Amino acid sequence: MKHIVQQIHFIGIGGAGMSGIAEVLLNLGYQVSGSDLAEGAVTKRLKGLGVVIHIGHDPKNIGTTEAVVISTAVAGNNPEVLAARAAKIPVIQRAVMLGELMRLKQGIAIAGTHGKTTTASLVASVLAEGGLDPTFVIGGKLNSAGANARLGRGDFIVVEADESDASFLQLFPAMEVVTNIDADHMDTYQHDMARLKQAFVQFIQRMPFYGVAVLCIDDANVRDIIPFVSQPVLRYGLSDDADIRAANVRADGTRMHFTVDRRTVRRHGNKPGPLNITLNLPGLHNVRNALAAIGIATELGVGDEAITKALSEFGGVGRRFQRYGEIPLDSGGSFTLIDDYGHHPVEMSATLAAARGAYPDRRLVLAFQPHRYTRTRDCFGEFVQVLRSFDALVLTDVYPAGEAKIPGADGKSLMKAAIAEEKNSKALLNSAAVAYAASITEMPEKLRQVLKDGDVLITMGAGSIFALPHTLSEAKHV
């Protein structure tokens, strides 16, 4: 590509998926520019690396670029898109550019409705500890690297494969992981689960004959598609028929301990033995994510010592059960602050279970911003069940992500339903422990009404709530 195109412009460069690709291309020697609506930590970092950053969208930003990269969040009437098309400059989707990057190395693509970022981070960390020095482009900041992307010298590139817009069908990886298949972004699949499953089968079939699909056998929908996959499959999970199987699982604060039985044969012919794992992450869902990384590493011949060391020393990922420490309360005492990206009921339930395991004797308080009206509508009942499983709750309205408002699928409706539900159940949540904030800026005041000494506060959501933990930690008290 480089002998034809040297200047590349990203519209919406501050997005997690876009910024990582931009950084790797810059390190490969391309001239990279980008624009975004607002300046943030990501754009500042990219600017410091040498990317030309424009704040705001303007046709002039296109300049002499030879290719323009957009995500599905960028509208077709964006002024820079219109200018590029008028000038006959190619406008390509983010997934297409990611696919071009993957042509340079052997791709390891992590797919699934939930857990992609953590699993990709674990895979990258284990391969790095094993001396394979991978390139990675992931959706969150890998704390050990201080970034969500890195150009390695090794033969492999670890990426996230996005099913939300079916763009994972643009990729041709050599190895794949599927963590789970759940009903989300169903507009893409005409609200048909069969179509969604078929898309994952198509994704797996894009691998070459020497590839391997590492699939979570614990997930019913993943199990359903295995008979339709012709490529080699490595099954992982806690199920008895898993090839990479965890057992003797126990929680120890924010760490998990378990043994791993590997019933596979390494590519170089030596049968791997059992492993004793200490994972520096909480929750059963992260045990499964670690098993996926163990499966990939085992297939690539990474040594057992490197696998166990990488998992025990894993530094975490930004906004995935990210711990901010203790925050003092004005009323006396303090609370523990944790931030998480979860925005689907399944993800929220997994985080809740991890928190209950890590902090079994403490109240769990949730500050939640729903994400997208369609998801709130489609998963309304599941959201209510999760919300009322916390001990206290502060809700705000839905982050629309460009969607039009849907009556009855908003924050106030969720709050009312969560309170009403308790009358017919043994839910822990009660109306005295619930508050509604009209905006994110009102949340600190509402939290003062519900937080008590010793509480664990989890801020959760995929929208503008990402700024709340920073606000709370910088204030040094609530």
From Swiss-Prot:
Catalytic activity line of the entry: UDP-N-acetyl-alpha-D-muramate + L-alanine + ATP = UDP-N-acetyl-alpha-D-muramoyl-L-alanine + ADP + phosphate + H(+)
Keywords from the UniProt entry: ATP-binding, Cell cycle, Cell division, Cell shape, Cell wall biogenesis/degradation, Cytoplasm, Ligase, Nucleotide-binding, Peptidoglycan synthesis
GO MF, any single term: ATP binding
Alphabetized SUPFAM superfamilies for the sequence: MurCD N-terminal domain, MurD-like peptide ligases, catalytic domain, MurD-like peptide ligases, peptide-binding domain
Gene Ontology cellular component terms for the protein in this record: cytoplasm
Location(s), subcellular: Cytoplasm
Metabolic or biological pathway: Cell wall biogenesis; peptidoglycan biosynthesis
Cell division as UniProt keyword: yes
Superkingdom field: Bacteria
GO biological process, one term: regulation of cell shape
Pfam families cross-referenced by the UniProt entry: Mur_ligase, Mur_ligase_C, Mur_ligase_M
Residues annotated for ATP binding in this entry: G112, T113, H114, G115, K116, T117, T118
Key word Plastid present: no
UniProt-listed Enzyme Commission number(s): 6.3.2.8
PANTHER family: UDP-N-ACETYLMURAMATE--L-ALANINE LIGASE (PTHR43445:SF3), UDP-N-ACETYLMURAMATE--L-ALANINE LIGASE-RELATED (PTHR43445)
Function: Cell wall formation.
Similarity comment text for this entry: Belongs to the MurCDEF family.
Listed name of the protein: UDP-N-acetylmuramate--L-alanine ligase
